[in-house]
Regions:
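Conserved alpha/beta catalytic core and glycan-binding cleft of carbohydrate-active enzymes
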Residues: 109-110, 299-301, 315-472, 500-555, ...
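Short, flexible loop/turn elements at secondary-structure junctions
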Residues: 42-44, 54, 67, 77, ...
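Substrate-binding/active-site clefts of carbohydrate-active enzymes
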Residues: 127-137, 146-322
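Short, contiguous acidic/charged loop-to-helix segments that flank catalytic cores in large enzymes
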Residues: 212-216, 278, 320-322, 430-436, ...
Length: 646
């Protein structure tokens, strides 16, 4: 039988659809026989057979080797759902039963056999695919989700929660209304490529082209994506292009050589997994094709790439130097993704200072659309964990992110990594009593959503979850029976709605002219204030991070205006301290300081925040003179106080 030729691009390292040839595919033989053809790249192998239930996993069907190192076979009479493996006779003398690296489906763990699957899905999401974009000047509010522990079916009793898992189709019906109610624009799924160990959360992958069978079939996952798109929700796939599980039945020493991984000390990661060898072009094509599968076959809207710092530097250590092969691969990957799917969103989890991560490849950048701002995350959580009395010395932590914000296109993330391994959940990290934690949680999220940058939150953050995440258990939905947690998730929904409907919070947010500090020196008071400037509207964000209120706190502006209250974190409906009538409208008065000639005076609640929508008014030509007179009077009072103290 004449087998399809492997495209030249595969061996050049820039193939994005190798899965169309490699792996298992239904076909018709020249004699009219219906069956499946198999193709696997194993250049170091001395022999390969296809084994499966069709022969009792015994002799197997011998495969033919091409000069390219690709082995092929045709087996008639097989059906979708049948299990198979490759028996690989390695260059080192080993004989190992291997899963198909390009399999589209795999049996449920602990089984490791590949499963024959077709990818002929019917989508009706054309309208969504036409209008989706990179959200540069639109809100991007991502809900990070672990499919197996968001919610379980009633009556689940298994310790690992597996009898409570929703399949992909069922999950869509449960999840989409929640996403819509809380105004998320996208859902980002922790890795769904097949993985043997639940506790790896998908980050130790074995089947890069297989949607995990824990939650159903490839067709059911396609239904999930299609359902999200029909309701206006994007789907982002978490992808692990740096390392893979070292299991003997998968990619490690696949043909008796270090085929996919490095063969030196850099071949193993800190997690005991194998690091991909980016200097082998066929490996680059493998990874590019795996990313391409999610974008092309499953209509995903973006890829979040995990642990990119471990690729940019050898072993993730800047002292060991830049891994130029990895940098070249990532540039090629992002360039290829953008060429084929230009409206997709491609994000990097990177904690290093490597330059130009989000610069286009034509400007020698790595080519990502967004980079997680790990510095913002650490500084924010550190500050809110600081005792109130020590916060004046830590005041700069909440200012620092804006010193470097415009160096990259940043996304602010409070992800799964921040609520595991003894780190505590977001609310439990905060300093103070239960009541103080609750008030500060509202203000912390106010800071997040009013700060420039796209947003991502792990599931449960919107509940004020106190228990650390456990992949074996569903979220503590009973929390919604408690007044604070129910009020907080409603506050979170309102905050997300404000973010989604106030253009000043997303339009032009990567332009330095669209942000201005108003109060950034009030370290003793713990007050921060800043302007978010839109094309037609300015918003004033005010935040008190201390445990006491500030009466008549002055904020100095460059223009006169009236102000309307948009959001009050201490409103009674969110469980806050403001039980009576609130002041909803404010006006500036003439006179200010620091060249800001107008003053807006507000009463700031303890640990509370305000969002005000500003409407400019006609300037007073005497305002500058009034400011100067105030400044002179202040100097005189200061001098008089000094003289009287002598």
């Amino acid at each position: 039988m004449n087998y399809p030729a492997i495209p030249r691009e595969f061996f050049n390292g820039d193939c994005f659809d190798a899965y169309r040839i490699l792996g298992a595919h239904p076909c018709t033989a020249p004699d009219g026989a219906e069956g499946w053809r198999f193709a696997v790249w194993a250049p170091g192998a001395t022999a390969v057979e296809v084994c499966g239930g069709f022969d009792g996993w015994e002799a197997g069907v011998p495969m033919e080797r091409a000069e390219t190192g690709v082995w092929s076979a045709f087996i008639p009479g097989l059906a979708e759902g049948d299990l198979y493996k490759y028996r690989v006779h390695g260059a080192d003398g080993s004989v190992v039963m291997r899963s198909d690296p390009y399999a589209f489906s795999t049996e449920l763990r602990p089984g490791t056999a590949s499963r024959l699957a077709k990818l002929d899905f019917a989508f009706d999401d054309h309208a969504w695919m036409e209008r989706r974009d990179k959200c540069r000047n639109r809100p991007l509010n991502i809900y990070e989700l672990h499919a197996g522990s968001w919610k379980h079916k009633p009556g689940s009793t298994q310790p690992d929660g597996s009898d409570g898992w929703y399949n992909y189709e069922e999950l869509a019906k449960e999840l989409i209304p929640w996403l819509l109610d809380h105004h998320f624009t996208h859902v980002e799924l922790l890795p769904l490529a097949e993985h043997p160990f639940d506790g790896s959360w998908g980050y130790q992958t074995t089947g890069y082209f297989s949607v995990t069978s824990r939650y159903g079939t490839p067709a059911q996952f396609a239904v999930f994506v299609n359902a999200c798109h029909r309701m206006g929700i994007g789907v982002i796939m978490d992808f692990v292009p740096v390392h893979f599980a070292a299991n003997a039945d998968a990619l490690a020493k696949f043909d008796g050589t270090h085929l996919y991984e490095y063969d030196s000390d850099v071949g193993q990661s800190e997690w005991g997994t194998c690091n991909f060898n980016y200097y082998r072009r066929e490996v680059c094509s493998f990874l590019s094709s795996a990313a391409g599968l999610w974008m092309d076959v499953y209509h995903c809207d973006g890829i979040r790439m995990d642990a990119i710092s471990r690729a940019l530097y050898w072993q993730g250590d800047p002292n060991r130097g830049v891994n130029q092969g990895a940098v070249n691969f990532l540039r090629s990957l992002n360039h290829g993704l953008n060429k084929r799917w230009p409206t997709g969103i491609y994000m990097a989890e990177d904690s290093t200072n490597f330059l130009k991560v989000t610069a286009p490849t034509r400007y020698e950048g790595v080519g990502f659309d967004y980079k997680w701002d790990m510095g913002w995350m650490h500084d924010t959580l550190d500050y809110f964990a600081t005792p109130f009395g020590e916060r004046p010395n830590a005041y700069g932590k909440l200012l620092f992110s804006m010193h470097y914000f415009y160096n990259e296109l940043y996304l602010l993330a409070l992800s799964h990594d921040e609520v595991v391994h003894g780190k505590k959940t977001i609310i439990d990290k905060l300093w103070g009593t239960y009541a103080e934690k609750c008030a500060q949680l509202r203000t912390l999220y106010f800071y997040m959503y009013m700060h420039p940058g796209k947003k991502l939150n792990f599931m449960g953050n919107e509940l004020g979850h106190f228990r650390e995440w456990d992949e074996k258990r569903e979220l503590d939905w009973d929390l919604l029976k408690y007044p604070f947690h129910d009020a907080f998730q409603k506050y979170f929904a309102r905050l997300s709605l404000v973010y989604a409907t106030e253009p000043a919070l997303f339009d032009g947010e990567y332009n330095p002219d669209c942000f201005e500090w108003v109060a950034s020196e009030s370290c003793t008071e713990g007050v921060y204030a800043w302007l978010r400037k839109g094309r037609s509207q300015n918003l004033l964000c005010i935040m008190n991070t201390q445990d006491h209120a500030h009466k008549k706190f002055p904020l100095y502006l460059k223009f006169p205006c009236s102000a309307e209250l948009v959001l009050d974190t201490e409103a009674a409906e969110w469980g806050g301290a403001h039980k009576g009538r609130r002041k909803l409208h404010f006006h500036t008065t003439d006179g200010g300081v620091y060249g800001r000639d107008y003053t807006l005076t507000v009463d700031l609640p303890a640990m509370g925040s305000f969002l005000l929508r500003l409407t400019p008014e006609a300037p007073n030509p005497d305002a500058a003179r009034i400011s100067a007179n105030k400044a002179m009077a202040q100097k005189r009072r200061t001098a008089r106080d000094k003289n009287s103290s002598k």
